[in-house]
From Swiss-Prot:
PANTHER family xrefs: PTHR47978
Gene Ontology cellular component list: endosome; Golgi apparatus; Golgi lumen; Golgi membrane; phagophore assembly site membrane
Cofactor or coenzyme needed: Mg(2+)
SMART domains recorded: RAB (SM00175), RAN (SM00176), RAS (SM00173), RHO (SM00174)
Position of sequence motif Switch 1: 54-66
Role, per record: The small GTPases Rab are key regulators of intracellular membrane trafficking, from the formation of transport vesicles to their fusion with membranes. Rabs cycle between an inactive GDP-bound form and an active GTP-bound form that is able to recruit to membranes different sets of downstream effectors directly responsible for vesicle formation, movement, tethering and fusion. RAB33B acts, in coordination with RAB6A, to regulate intra-Golgi retrograde trafficking.
Gene that specifies this protein: RAB33B
Chief location category: Golgi
Localisation per UniProt entry: Golgi apparatus membrane; Golgi apparatus, cis-Golgi network; Preautophagosomal structure membrane
Top-rank taxon, per record: Eukaryota
Protein name per Swiss-Prot or TrEMBL: Ras-related protein Rab-33B
Lineage: Eukaryota, Metazoa, Chordata, Craniata, Vertebrata
Keywords recorded for this protein, A-Z: Autophagy, Golgi apparatus, GTP-binding, Hydrolase, Lipoprotein, Magnesium, Membrane, Metal-binding, Methylation, Nucleotide-binding, Prenylation, Protein transport, Transport
Membrane association type: Lipid-anchor
Binding site for GTP: 41-46, 60, 63, 89, 146-147, 149, 177-178
Length: 228
């Protein structure tokens, strides 16, 4: 993969690039890598699953290492692939993967649990980690408060989160990956980034990411509920 933070160009055919029957080659897609960052159990995996699969996962395993999902969208007639990279929040699972995780990032989604004040207070450390890996403020960033459906358990008020978002020049979204009524809201989070990236990132020819290198399969473990 190229070192520059530019969108990569994927060809939907392989080999010599010729098309059977001599027809026109298939359309090409720009690929944008968006990383989803936050403490464990804030609902990162469920948010990415909701956007890519259109539904809430009933059961899931804890993320170990790095995983990603992708979805193709069409914006202004252009087909774009959005890759959502999700990583384990625990430090012991991140040490060996963090350098690869931050490579060629186009945008960042910071996620906290609205019912867990500690996850909100961890946000500065996640922002600092991004800075340490040379992700500047020029890269589009969004702040997401998850689990807004648990109204009686909210610990992070909107005004506090909005002040933090304004300080760091990020838009704030409050949503629920679980509540089907918030499906359009989850959609808006990632489509907002997709529109920004489409408008500002030039086209560059690059090899698409190697799935074998970035999709880390966890060891078999008992299934657990996705708390989001």
């Amino acid at each position: 993969m190229a070192a520059e933070l530019e969108s990569s160009l994927e060809l939907s055919f392989t080999g010599s690039g010729t098309v059977p029957g001599g027809g026109l080659p298939p359309a090409r897609s720009r690929i944008f890598k968006i990383i989803v960052i936050g403490d464990s159990n804030v609902g990162k995996t469920c948010l990415t699953y909701r956007f890519c699969a259109g539904r809430f996962p009933q059961r899931t395993e804890a993320t170990i290492g790095v995983d990603f999902r992708e979805r193709a969208v069409t914006i202004d007639g252009e087909r774009i692939k959005i890759q959502l990279w999700d990583t384990a929040g625990q430090e012991r699972f991140r040490k060996s993967m963090v350098q690869h995780y931050y490579r060629n990032v186009h945008a960042v989604v910071f996620v906290y649990d609205m019912t867990n004040l500690a996850s909100f207070h961890s946000l500065p450390s996640w922002i600092e980690e991004c800075k340490q890996h040379l992700l500047t403020n020029d890269i589009p960033r969004i702040l997401v408060g998850n689990k807004c459906d648990l109204r009686n358990a909210i610990q992070v008020p909107t005004d506090l989160a909005q002040k933090f978002a304004d300080t760091h020049s990020m838009p704030l979204f409050e949503t629920s990956a679980k509540n089907p009524n918030d499906n359009d809201h989850v959609e808006a989070i990632f489509m907002t980034l997709a529109h920004k990236l489409k408008s500002h990132k030039p086209l560059m020819l690059s090899q698409p990411p190697d799935r074998d290198q970035i999709h880390i399969k966890p060891e078999p473990k008992p299934a657990m509920t996705c708390w989001c």
